[in-house]
Structures are given as C-alpha cells and as structure tokens.
A protein has these predicted regions:
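Beta-sheet repeat architectures centered on beta-propellers
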Residues: 1-99, 103-122, 236-252, 257-443
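Surface-exposed ligand/attachment interfaces on beta-rich extracellular proteins
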Residues: 58-65, 102-106, 138-152, 191-194, ...
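Short loop/turn segments that connect beta-strands within beta-propeller blades
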Residues: 91-94, 135-138, 180-182, 221-224, ...
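Hydrophobic or amphipathic alpha-helical targeting/insertion segments
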Residues: 111-146
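Carboxylate/His-rich catalytic cores and anion/metal-binding grooves
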Residues: 151-179
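Short, solvent-exposed loop/turn segments at conserved positions within beta-propeller repeat blades
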Residues: 170, 211, 313-317
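A short, charged helix-loop
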Residues: 179-191
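Surface-exposed extracellular loop regions of Gram-negative outer-membrane beta-barrel proteins
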Residues: 208-234
C-alpha cells in the first residue's frame, strides 16, 4: 500500500564533510562523519580506491622511503626513490642502486625535498652535508658542487633558471641562489636573510615565495644585475611544514600550520580554509609531528591530499584528508596505512611506506589484498521540524552495485529504536555458468 510520508532528501553531498557542526545543524548536502570515502563531482559518495605495490620487492631490506618521484632525464622518464641510506632508480618497478659514493643518512624524519633543475635532479634533506644530484641514465648520484657556501640545506626550489636552497645548518634564516644557468656556481654574497628560520620555498606567480612560521616573503626579479631580486614580507603567517606547500589552479598556495590548513593568493593576508576539520578532526592530530606532514596535488581530480598524524602519540602520517578544488570542500580521512613521502607517478598518487615499498594509490578495490572499511554519516535533520517528534521513519537508500561486498544502512535518532539493514551485494562475476546463490548472486 502507498506510504503517506513527508519527503526529506539527503544528498547530493557537494558540501563534503564538516566535523565542526553537529549533525542536526548540517544541510542536506553535508556529511557529518566519514572514513575511506570520496565525494564525486555529482556529490555522490563512494568508497575510495585501493593501492598496490609499485615495486614488488622491498628496497634496501625494507628501509623507510624518504622521497620518491618521476622526472625526465636525458630524454628518458625515470622513477626514483630514497630508501634508508640508499638512492634507487625504480623505473618500471625494479630497483637499481644508484647511490654511488654519496652519503645518505637513514632515518624516518630525514625526508628529502627535490626539484628538477633543468636536466638534473637535485635533492636536500637537512641532515647530510651536501645536496645530491642525479642526471639519470646509468649514472650514479653525486654530491652537488656548492662552492662550500653552505651545508645541510632543508628546502629547495628551481626558479628563474637558478637553484635555490634554504635553512642551512649554520644560518637557518638564509636562502642561497646559484648563478643563472649554472646550478653549481654560488657567489659568496648570493644569499638573502629573512630573520626567521626558513620553513619552505615555492615559486608562486612571478615570485619565489619564502616561508617562515612568522610570514611569507617574496623575491621578485628587478632586472638590475647589481641587485637582481627585491625582498619583501607579504604576510604575517607562513607554513610550519615545507613539504605541505602546494600551488593549485587559480593561483592559490595551500599549506599547513599548527591550527589548520591555510591558503595564500598573493595578497597581504592568508586565509584558513580548514574550519570544517576543526573540533572533530584537527584536535586529534599530534601537533608536535605536523612539521613532518606533507601534501600532494592530484591534477586529474584537482585534489590536494594532506598526509597527517592522527592520534595524540602518533608519529607517522596515518591519515589523509583531501581538499577538492572543484567542489571547494573536504572529505576523508583515508586511513588504514602509514606513509612517509608522496609524489605523482604516471598521473596517479604514489606514496612511500616504512617497509621499502612505493605504494600505487587510486588502484583496485582493496589495499594490497586487504578489505577497505568505509562508511559515511549524513546530516540528522528533523523531517517535520524540531517541534515535531516522529514515531516512524521510512528510509529509501539509492546506491550502485560495483563490487562483492555487503552494504549496511543504519538509522539512528532520538526516541526511535536504531535499525541496521544489511544488503548482500554478492559477486558481480556470478553468471549462469557458475554457482548461483539465492539472495546473493547478481543476475
């Protein structure tokens, strides 16, 4: 018989997740809680994709991956990784040791930042005396010639045809620049001092942005050979984690601070954009480990993945919250794994783990063979308003059958007994030529 009822539609969920507002106060397009789910362009929510090993055999006896990436060197596309005290060419998923005579100190926190400087890969980690360079092919890595101007730089950039490094072990507030067109020639006075420890470098618009925790400074070309760059402080806040600086379409620079995630568009102020993560998510992070967090821009989806330490005593990055530039909303976290570095390889997110592997994300429906536990919780709106208490609710849920799993739909509300309905999705591979199970197999 027909059901006499008022209709209350929840979704599409284009507002993403908001951990700072009670479920009762969210709009129908908001999400109260979620795990391992993604929000699509139509506002649909789906379980995230999984990951598989990029290199089947662990590098360096299962040491921690401290950097990875994909670059074109000598006309060939190369995948590389720093793992423990070694540097590897991992092109094609097979690791070849290219450490040579370079010194690489192993340690989970000795992560590398790298740039492609013309036809040379250059990387720094703030721990080893020299920056490391690699020209690809069958060559080994080697120490960068820096004319003995600095040691142990933490941050690096390539801009205006020059190599830039910042926060060296003796003068942490200084940024050095190479000669134009020559990354291994460094003048004795070719540096800029900023008064505070440099926390990150990133080209932005027509400038080089230099981050300190106390502000963002810019270096701008002057066209004058005597003073080739003018220096100016633009904001009163900068990042605490250099590996989280990401520039996205629309000329917006995103980065992490202790209280949240901010954006800078080039003006005199920065803006916090992660209010939706306050209260229910951000306070659970280990703030002491945020300087070791990192971020990755996923161009195909226009997403920024922030790898963060969830848990008061958590030291490794075990939680990924995602900002959608297209929807201007947040979703996540993704969890169930730990990562130490990330990069785009073959247009997909890849991340290094603590066991010598690069993991290829956004692939398959499981995590290297393990099931993904995912859920999301909608807003909790009163169907007839706050003044009316309903005794019965009729729930209709729409979903797509895309795999072999069970779908559970749970309803909870005040004064109404909670109910869980489990729908057995069955195996999409079931056909007339295989075993058919009533109420489970798909026709």
């Amino acid at each position: 018989m027909p059901i006499a009822a008022e209709s209350l539609r929840l979704g599409p969920w284009r507002d993403g997740v908001n951990y700072s507002v009670p479920a009762e106060d969210l709009s129908p397009s908001g999400i109260h809680d979620m795990q391992n789910c993604t929000v699509g362009l139509a506002g649909e929510v789906s379980k995230r994709k999984g990951f598989v090993k990029f290199n089947s055999s662990a590098m360096n006896s299962g040491a921690t991956v401290t950097a990875l990436g994909q670059v074109t060197l000598a006309g060939a596309e190369k995948v590389f990784a720093f793992c423990g005290n070694k540097f590897f060419d991992v092109t094609g998923g097979s690791a070849t040791d290219r450490t040579g005579s370079t010194t690489i100190t192993a340690g989970n926190d000795y992560t590398w930042q790298w740039v492609l400087a013309g036809d040379t890969l250059v990387a720094v980690n703030g721990q080893d005396t020299d920056a490391i360079k690699w020209t690809g092919g069958s060559n080994n890595a080697a120490a960068l010639d820096d004319d003995s101007r600095f040691t142990k730089p933490n941050h690096i950039a390539f801009w205006e045809n020059r190599l830039w490094v910042g926060n060296t072990n003796t003068v942490p507030d200084r940024v050095w620049r190479s000669d134009a067109g020559d990354i291994e020639t460094w003048g004795a006075l070719n540096y800029h001092a900023f008064g505070y420890d440099v926390t990150g470098l990133s080209p932005f618009q027509s400038t080089l942005s230099v981050h300190t925790e106390q502000g963002i400074h810019t270096l701008t070309p002057t066209g004058n050979s005597t003073i080739p760059f003018s220096q100016q402080q633009r904001t009163q806040r900068g990042t605490i984690a250099g590996r989280t600086i990401v520039t996205i379409p629309g000329e917006r620079q995103l980065f992490v601070r202790e209280d949240g995630i901010y954006q800078w568009t080039g003006g005199p102020a920065v803006e916090k954009i992660s209010f939706a993560l306050d209260d229910g998510y951000w306070p659970n992070l280990n703030s002491a480990r945020l300087p070791y967090s990192f971020a990755l821009f996923y161009p195909a989806e226009e997403q920024v993945w922030f790898f963060l330490p969830f848990g008061a005593s958590q030291t490794q990055m075990n939680s990924v919250v995602i900002y959608s530039n297209r929807l201007n909303c947040w979703f996540g976290p993704y969890n169930g794994f730990t990562r130490n570095a990330a990069a785009m390889i073959d247009e997909l997110p890849h991340a290094g783990d603590f066991a010598g592997h690069i993991q290829k994300h956004e692939t398959g429906n499981n995590d290297d063979g393990s099931a993904i536990k995912a859920f999301f919780e909608t807003a909790s709106l009163a169907p007839l308003g706050d003044a009316v208490q309903c005794r019965w609710l009729y729930n209709r849920t729409l979903f797509d059958n895309t795999g072999d799993f069970d779908l559970s739909v749970t309803q909870t509300s005040a004064s109404i007994v909670s109910n869980v309905e489990t729908i057995q999705m069955g195996d999409l591979g079931a056909t007339l030529n295989t075993t058919f199970t009533l109420d489970a197999s798909v026709l």
